[in-house]
Amino acid sequence: MNQNHTILQNLPVGQKVGIAFSGGLDTSAALLWMKLKGALPYAYTANLGQPDEDDYNAIPKKAMEYGAENARLIDCRAQLAHEGIAAIQCGAFHVSTGGIAYFNTTPLGRAVTGTMLVSAMKEDDVNIWGDGSTYKGNDIERFYRYGLLTNPALKIYKPWLDQQFIDELGGRHEMSEFLIANGFNYKMSVEKAYSTDSNMLGATHEAKDLEFLNSGIKIVKPIMGVAFWDENVEIEPEEVSVRFEEGVPVALNGKEYADPVELFLEANRIGGRHGLGMSDQIENRIIEAKSRGIYEAPGMALFHIAYERLVTGIHNEDTIEQYRINGLRLGRLLYQGRWFDSQALMLRETAQRWVAKAVTGEVTLELRRGNDYSILNTESPNLTYQPERLSMEKVEGAAFTPLDRIGQLTMRNLDITDTRAKLGIYSQSGLLSLGEGSVLPQLGNKQ
């Protein structure tokens, strides 16, 4: 593969060009422009269960009206649910503020979209792909990686990297006028104070007014839940139970779901009634510049809370520590568009095999407003939490006796003695100032 020619800077006239088509202004104008300039556009739309999309079937029809040679709707929901569950099992979330995580819902969506749309293009012998991602964002690299992983012969053509397209249709007003001039009665939607991208797992709100840190979450109108910060919004406390079998969520409130898509939709409805899973994050983009986003993920948050409760009740401390360390690393790889790279697969396999397989049980929670909740009950046949081991009451057949603890504490003398010696060395070298005003207590002599 010749990297110098992977990215095409000019429209490939007379050739098939696949475009990830959303039906919005940008992709509509781009498709028509490519058609009029002599390319053969093929439109591919991913059904990701976007909560703000009313009629998926209308999108390919619209693409045909704008001049697509063919237009296909690709149902990506089952695969997206599968990847979302995998992320929950692995704790693949590296961005958090105050203990509230961003659930990497956009990166998960890009992993599914990038592979499934390019796979559909291969079926149609379309080997040139364009999408609406900008050069400043993460998606341009994510789609690049997933596209080439799926089709190594793929060429990339992005209208927003083509100077001719930018010169002719560089803004929303110009694109709207272009469509009208060509006989399409396109009416621009009223611009919001921010942009939104969503799929079944979550929604991302960013850019425009949200680029300013003095614009808070209150300017956002949630699309997956309620504005829990608004005192006029009535939110009643609600009990909900979540059941897992071998790391897979299978039931909500006692009702089993064979279809993971329906399971996620119901989890979104439950969590959304409370605004669960909304967060405000500052993160590092792939190119190391910081960006800010407001995120929604009610179902992911609900599953994550219940899953981690079971993890902490079932696994030992060292396993939990490794699960968290690996999850942070895996979350970053997912964010970077490396969800299917070997290093990510290695981390995923470790968590799914050795952590998730033991996670069977049910957690009952009370949801209130936003991320305010209480855990009411935890049940699992695999719990290693056994209260009688540490009961403050007198119990028959105690796991250990006072004499056992005396022996255990006596063994600690070895490392305590070594630690005292090290502190003395640090003091002599000037690294520590021992005595009055020191952060350490007075140790006396070194013996």
From Swiss-Prot:
Coiled coil: none annotated. Pfam families: Arginosuc_syn_C, Arginosuc_synth. It catalyses: L-citrulline + L-aspartate + ATP = 2-(N(omega)-L-arginino)succinate + AMP + diphosphate + H(+). L-aspartate binds at T134, N138, D139. The keyword ATP-binding applies. Pathway: Amino-acid biosynthesis; L-arginine biosynthesis; L-arginine from L-ornithine and carbamoyl phosphate: step 2/3. GO terms for molecular function: argininosuccinate synthase activity; ATP binding; protein homodimerization activity. ATP binds at A20, F21, S22, G23, G24, L25, D26, T27, S28, A46, G132, T134, D139, D197. CDD domains: ASS. It comes from the Bacteria. It is an enzyme of class 6 (ligase). InterPro entries: Arg_succ_synth_type2_subfam, Arginosuc_syn_C, Arginosuc_syn_N, Arginosuc_synth, Arginosuc_synth_CS, Arginosuc_synth_type_1_subfam, AS_cat/multimer_dom_body, AS_multimer_C_tail. GO terms for biological process: argininosuccinate metabolic process; L-arginine biosynthetic process; urea cycle. It is found in: Cytoplasm. L-citrulline binds at Y102, N138, R142, S195, T204, E206, E283. Belongs to the argininosuccinate synthase family. Type 2 subfamily. Homotetramer. This is Argininosuccinate synthase.
